[in-house]
Amino acid sequence: MKYLLLALLLCLAVGTAGGFKIVKTCEKDPRGYIADLGNGKYLMHLEGSPYEMGYQHGCLKGAEVQSMTKEFVKSVLAGYDIPEDLIPGLLKLGKEVAKGNEKYVPSEFREEMRGIADGARDAGYDVDYDDVLLLNMGFDVILSIAYPIATPIVAWQDKKGVACDGFVAMDDATSDGRVLMGRSFMFNPEVFHEVALLIEQYPDRGHRFVSVSAPGFVGVTAAMSSAGIAIGMDMVPAMDTKPFVSGMGCLLTARQVVQYADELSDAVNMVKGSKRGVPWLYIVGDGKGREKGGAVLEVSADKFAVRYMDYRYPEWAESLDFPKQIEDKDDLVVVANHYIVPEMYSTISYAVKDSLWRYETLTGLILDSYGSIDVEKGKELIDYLHPPNYGYYGEDENVPVAATRTLFDLSNLELWSLYGMYTDPWAHWELTTEYQPAGLDKAWKDTEGDVAGPSWKPINYGAPIIDKEKMLDSADLQKLSEADGNYVEQCVKAYAGNPNYATIHLRFNVQSSANIMLTVADQNDGLEIYAWNYNTNDWQKVYDRIYPSGFTTLRLSLGSEFVNNRKADLVLISEAKWKFGMIYDKACVAVDAAAVT
């Protein structure tokens, strides 16, 4: 039996032509990376199983996760004038409440949190699972303690400007009929504004999605999926709260929606069926499904109502001293921080003056722009409080954004988000359509990376060792890194050990084109390499020859026809059928990114 040894060395197209550059990868799992979007804005890309995505997250942003779990959580409490000596006790109570509600959190999200903690800890930072759990459930934990006494929370909200706004507009409301959703997440800016970024996730189950977030969050505050679903949430003070019961929390509920909802009705049913202890308002948009549009979900611990775009305020409630609905269009819905549906407001809820003012102002501005809302107008509308602060609007811009302003184009899967400082530019990202590889039937199925069967042995690669054909030691790598600011290290994960076929499937993160370098070692066997051609929708043979015994370096230049959604796929087939295949265990490459287009 002949054996095939492959060292798989990846040279990524990470220049600026595609609008971003990969600047960091997770050494132990390089599918996770940080991309520089320019202007000081970054995106973190994660993919794989829940634990794998979590580990990549902690590995890449361990310092920031530590800041969020330690300093941000403390700053939230300190921001409400809680004496400093009481904060440690409240944090301890918060962790106990979170732990008591952990059973409501899906196991996959718990695994992702464990991955974050492990990745951050392996990177040398003081983060444990309970820290990450509290960060992700903290909003609901705090409110499950505070809302039952209601009045102080209302005073805090009115004083501190803890508030959010949102809208969904489509059809006649927008300039070309597209579905636009605005989401203003207004919260304590401490720490958050310094570490905020976009997080793009390719989970092994469900839809891919991108969120405007901060390191440490498994849950989402504003996110959009490849199915065209977007979601955000607003606080709403109400007495229908279960003390010390947070359920899975609003952030994780929103994460479940954005990852698994195919259309608006799925989102509604997921929120309705979730375990809740605290009232919230969820705004959901759908730009791709059969139920294209938007809705506001008004929920409390035990009650639930949906305000779709065609909702009309009932006549019987007109005489009541309840907040009234202003928008009366079938292609528009707006939300602030109070219930509109009378049956929900009657649960002893509170509409603070600031929320009423924001709802009236934003709705009025949207109606004034009705029919002409495009991307630029949508950004202007959701950032109408530029900048917000208690007691004034629109004066000093040299302040942190508290915390994000985001516009989603749900028809075209694009987002624009303002975070950091008000003087910063908006970050932009396009979430491409669902990636569905295909081809080479049996060979593909036997080598499909992340769904490998029990006969497969996963191989995790180590340190970079090869640049072109030169063997490099650590000193060489250090020199290369210092000499060239475009230097990157990138690895690839694959699977070996298939007893039926000497085949390996590789999926590369690339831009519009890529140079792939493979170092192979074998005993006079033939090797065929196929790449998926998106122009012909078929596999195209890009290499076929018998190579001599020993190490041979192959270079493949893949044009744009082999790249889709920043992915390129290769299948390698050897003449040798192996029983115990092996892959060379150090399969990374040090490359000059500027030389790759």
Curated annotation (Swiss-Prot):
The keyword Transmembrane helix applies. It holds the Pfam family AAT. GO terms for cellular component: plasma membrane. The chain crosses the membrane at residues 4-23, 209-231. The keyword Cell membrane applies. It is found in: Cell membrane. Gene3D superfamilies: Penicillin V Acylase, Chain A (3.60.60.10). Keywords: Cell membrane, Membrane, Transmembrane, Transmembrane helix. It is a multi-pass membrane protein. It comes from the Archaea. This is Uncharacterized protein AF_0267. It comes from Archaeoglobus fulgidus (strain ATCC 49558 / DSM 4304 / JCM 9628 / NBRC 100126 / VC-16). The lineage of its organism: Archaea, Methanobacteriati, Methanobacteriota, Archaeoglobi, Archaeoglobales.
